[in-house]
Amino acid sequence: MEKDTGTTHRRHRPGLRALPSGVALGHLKAASEASELQRSRSLGGLQPEGDPPSRPRKPHKELESEDQGKDPSSNAEDASCQKNLAQDKKESFSTLGKLGHESGKQDPEREKSDLEASMQEVQEGEHADGGLQEAKEQEAESIKLNDLQEEEKASVFVEIDLGDHAEEVVTDAKKEEKPSQMDVEDLSEDEMQTSWVCCIPYSTRKRAKEST
């Protein structure tokens, strides 16, 4: 198609030599514009039916003008977003710094408390060890005393003579028998007196009273 249109234009063109220079240039411009229009129409007609028609391309200047018109608002939004991000970062850093400072303050206190607790544990362990040692010493002393007492008892039983012991037992028995005999004699005399008094007849008593 393009070749045909070119040939037709060439056929209708008059010779450049016959026309003046100004007319020839104007004719060439018109011919070029007409050829471009025909090409655009031919390209638009050759597009497939299913595909949508291609959008006409905007000139570069119009795109630049649109971009320039959109730039101020977008730039303002970008700047505000950047400011917000910077503020968020500052706040996060400040909070982290505060937490670190507080943790730094708390760490010495924790260390002090840990040291005190460890010292108390050590002291308690020492007291417990001392108590165990004292208990062991007391047990050893008690065992020694028991052994000594048992040895003394065994030696006493061994040193006693049977003869002396028998004599002591006999003397003790004699001493016990003497007071018992005395008691029996006293009782017999009392009983005799009472019995003799009781045996006096009643008439003799009256006579004794009258004689007095």
From Swiss-Prot:
Biased composition range(s): Polar residues: 71-85
Name of the protein: Uncharacterized protein C13orf46
Composition skew (Basic and acidic residues), residue ranges: 61-70, 99-115, 124-144, 168-180
Protein source organism: Homo sapiens
Signal sequence coordinates: none
Positions of the UniProt region annotated as Disordered: 1-148, 168-190
Top-rank lineage group of the source organism: Eukaryota
